[in-house]
A protein has these predicted regions:
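Active-site loop/oxyanion-hole signature of alpha/beta-hydrolase fold enzymes
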Residues: 1-33, 212
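Conserved hydrolase catalytic core segment
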Residues: 24-68
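A conserved amphipathic alpha-helix that caps or lines the catalytic cleft of carbohydrate-
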Residues: 18, 41-42, 184
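Active-site acidic short loop of glycosyltransferases
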Residues: 19-25, 47, 162-163, 189
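Catalytic active-site module of serine/aspartate enzymes centered on a nucleophile-bearing elbow/loop
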Residues: 189-225
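Flexible "cap/lid" loop of the alpha/beta hydrolase fold
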Residues: 51-93
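Conserved loop-alpha-helix segment in the C-terminal half of the alpha/beta-hydrolase fold
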Residues: 155-198
């Protein structure tokens, strides 16, 4: 039901979860599109009890995301660029050649490990990825936003967040490190951690380094009470 596929529903879900689990005081991390809902939560709800926020490989602004994607696409071999341009002009996102070309992008910037990534078999009873929601709200690929989030942009509202912020991204992330430093300058109290040799899926590429970065941030927040 596409009526339910709205930003507000996912934002409200954060409140529902906090109330159900009685999470009065929290540090909240949103990864990728999770950061979209997290920043919307912080701006529209102005929630109490949030000690800090982590925007991990964040989608804060669709214009910024597409600008980053354009830069990263321009670094691909010209043959791959031409293939992507050809099929996007035709709006044919299922052609085998196009899928191979997009996988080349993903292998560089989505995950630095073997692509495609196989699901974690240890996560039992976890439903598969919902392509319908992804395509409706986002689009056909990571670098082509055609869905309801196409015009999303909260970067101008970052200075409204008074809680400590950590912007974290992979060295080769779709959310480019340069953009993280841009967001830091737009924020009141923010720091940046760049995870070496990681793509967008930082917690898969470099889980130990992510843990260390988050721990440093938490210690900094707790020590500055």
């Amino acid at each position: 039901d596409t009526i339910l596929w709205k930003t507000e529903r996912f934002v409200n879900g954060i409140d529902f979860l906090r109330k159900a689990l009685k999470l009065d005081n929290v540090h909240i991390m949103g990864h990728s599109c999770g950061s979209t809902f997290l920043i919307e939560y912080m701006i529209t709800k102005q929630p109490k009890g949030v000690k800090s926020v982590i925007f991990s490989s964040p989608h804060i602004s669709s214009p910024d995301w597409m600008a980053d994607a354009k830069i990263l696409l321009s670094q691909l071999p010209m043959s791959i660029q031409d293939t992507i341009s050809k099929y996007e002009a035709l709006k044919n996102y299922t052609a085998p050649e196009y899928l191979v070309a997009t996988d080349s992008f993903y292998a560089r910037h989505l995950s630095r490990k073997h692509w495609p990534i196989h699901p974690n078999v240890e996560c039992e009873n976890v439903p598969g990825f919902n392509d319908q929601i992804y395509e409706y709200m986002w689009g056909p690929t990571e670098f082509n936003i055609t869905g309801t989030l196409k015009d999303f942009d909260r970067s101008v509202d970052l200075d409204k967040i008074t809680e400590p912020i950590l912007f974290m991204a992979g060295e080769f992330d779709e959310a480019r490190p340069e953009t993280m430093y841009k967001y830091q300058k737009l924020s009141r109290n923010a720091s940046v951690e760049i995870i070496e040799n990681a793509g967008h899926k930082t917690m898969i590429d470099q889980p130990e380094k992510v843990y260390e970065a988050v721990s440093r941030f938490f210690n900094k927040v707790e020590n500055n009470k």
